[in-house]
């Protein structure tokens, strides 16, 4: 296992395992609590096939936008700008926030370093037109809206007891998985 670190950027753990006639490289970008894996598979006479699984960091991570922009640049360098398959495992903020946090970097990269995504896989729950997925998404979005309103309402109360504060913090933790809550707007 090779590991390279940088005080200004993400930590990258590499593990290359030999599989048959070729080597597969799996890179885990450790940018705090969050997920981002890059798998590269050599191909004869062409650039390696690249698979990116998730691209995020936990809500409230210090300098998250800088970290994710640096990670995007590193991924562009390692893939020669092409991700053959992007897999988004699920919609939690720590799995998808990089696309929001590094959006301007992804859009404004020089042509030679720009990231292109050829194919996208998402969870079945994200498929428009799937009757069950559509119902689940609708109900889930209603619940997120209700939780956000409850949090916003409770956060404005004065003289709240310790038990209520702990409950409010727990609710904020749930909201943080979806990129919502106080941590998004700079609160605790």
Q: Predicted regions: what is each one?
A:
Residues 1-24, 102-188:
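Flexible, acidic/histidine-containing loops and adjacent segments that form or flank the divalent-metal
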Residues 48-49, 61-120:
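Active-site metal-binding motif and surrounding structural segment of the metallo-beta-lactamase
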Residues 19-81, 146:
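Conserved beta-strand hairpin/beta-sheet module of binuclear metal-dependent hydrolase folds
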Residues 28, 32-35, 43, 57-59, ...:
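Short, flexible loop/turn elements at secondary-structure junctions
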Residues 41, 64-65, 100-101, 133-136:
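Short coil/turn segments at secondary-structure boundaries
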